[in-house]
Regions:
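Conserved helicase NTPase catalytic core signature
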Residues: 1-7
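Conserved motor-region signature of P-loop NTPase helicases/translocases
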Residues: 9, 13-23, 27-204
């Protein structure tokens, strides 16, 4: 459990080759990777890591998001001079305000110190960094599926999603393109899944 790094001569030699070391998606690193990155850095002073615990998806290959959490917890805020330190990038420029508000609402209720190692409070919340044209349609919806009320041969969730998609297409919900607006088409819609175990039901 000791996370100290005893640098080999090779690690020291390699560290001289890198002015800066930048690692993205650090929430998905494991202990071995973390120690390797630290070993080839200059006492971590030139090691720049970026991560978001909410996006950790590689548990199947032993990702340890708690490594990133511990660094965030113990590093001081960057004062413009001293390293290592942390910088909180909480502004989101790619999403509507309604989306960031929805994300904050959901995660503030499901993420806690006990369950995820982090309390999702105001200091963790996303801030909308850009203004977008107001939409007449909801940017996000949360559907609770009552499986007992859906009688079908497929997964209730798959059937429910199919109904939503068919309704959007039937009602010709407008989507914005470079040349203006047009009715939504099936090819515009993407279904994100946690895994492929039940993919056949969704395909059907």
């Amino acid at each position: 459990d000791d996370d100290t790094v005893d640098r080999t001569e090779l690690a020291k030699e390699l560290s001289h080759k890198y002015t800066e070391i930048l690692i993205d998606e650090y929430q998905d690193t494991n202990k071995a990777q973390d120690m390797l990155f630290r070993a080839i850095s200059d006492n971590e002073e030139n090691l720049f890591i970026v991560g978001d615990v909410k996006q950790s998806i590689y548990g199947f290959r032993l990702a340890m998001p708690e490594i990133f959490l511990q660094k965030r917890k113990h590093l001081p805020d960057f004062n413009g001079k001293n390293y290592p330190a942390k910088i909180n990038l909480d502004e989101n420029f790619r999403s509507r305000k309604e989306v960031t508000e929805y994300i904050n609402y959901v995660f503030s209720r499901v993420m806690s110190e006990d369950s995820c190692g982090i309390n999702y409070d105001d200091s963790e919340s996303l801030k909308a960094g850009a203004d977008y044209e107001k939409s007449a349609f909801p940017c996000a919806e949360l559907h609770i599926v009552d499986k007992s009320k859906i009688d079908c041969e497929y997964l209730p969730e798959a059937s429910h999603i199919a109904d939503i998609i068919n309704k959007l297409v039937a009602e010709k919900m407008p989507v914005k393109t470079k040349s203006g607006y047009r009715p939504v088409m099936y090819k515009d819609i993407c279904i994100l899944m946690r895994g492929l175990n039940d993919a056949d039901d969704y395909f059907d």
